[in-house]
Amino acid sequence: PHGNLRSNFLKFLRNFLQFIITFFLSFFYKIKKDDKIFISVATYAPWIKDKKFSYFFNFFKNFTLLDETRAYTLWKLSTDLKDKKGDILDVGCLLGGSGFIMSKNNKIGSVILYDSFEGFNESEGLHKKENIFFYENINFVKKTIKYLKLENTYVEKTFFPNNLKRKIKKIKICHLDVNTYKSTKKAFYWVEKKIIKGGVIIFDDYGIW
């Protein structure tokens, strides 16, 4: 509760650390009166007590670049919507970890993972020909799906939403992780027409590119 002993102690500790850090930085930088250093005291971390999530994340973390916080968001959403009609899309799946996480809880509909497996689209300006994820491989994802025995889970190689093999009618969750504005915009306008009432679209890397 707001104002309890723990909360007040964290606020005191935050203010103390801000003072110490500002003091030492002042020897190296010119700090203005209005300049502030922000230290978060947020302690809400529900994934710590979710033993089922922790168990699976310890395994799935080898197949994703998502941190525990973002992975838990996908886990929780897929749990909440597991009985809703519609498919789950993971656009920009890389090694498949984010899709695997959502697939583990799903009961109705398919989980479909999409990736070009070629890096960024050549039309993406500064990003063209920069295949920084050189270990992308669709066969690796297919084998992992089979190894994990994930039901109704598939992977397609494409620059989403072009040339999709499976017909998508309704979407209950879409995780967009395509790194660039142009690709994200194109995918979003396609997905929003098919998202169900109460469905969710998650933008990863928001504000980075």
Locate predicted features.
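Residue-level marker of regulatory loop/turn positions in helix-turn-helix DNA-binding domains and
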Residues: L66
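S-adenosylmethionine/decaboxylated-SAM
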Residues: W47-F63, W75, K82-W209
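Membrane-proximal basic amphipathic "stem/tether" segments
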Residues: P1-N62
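N-terminal pre-P-loop "Q-motif" helix
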Residues: T69-T73
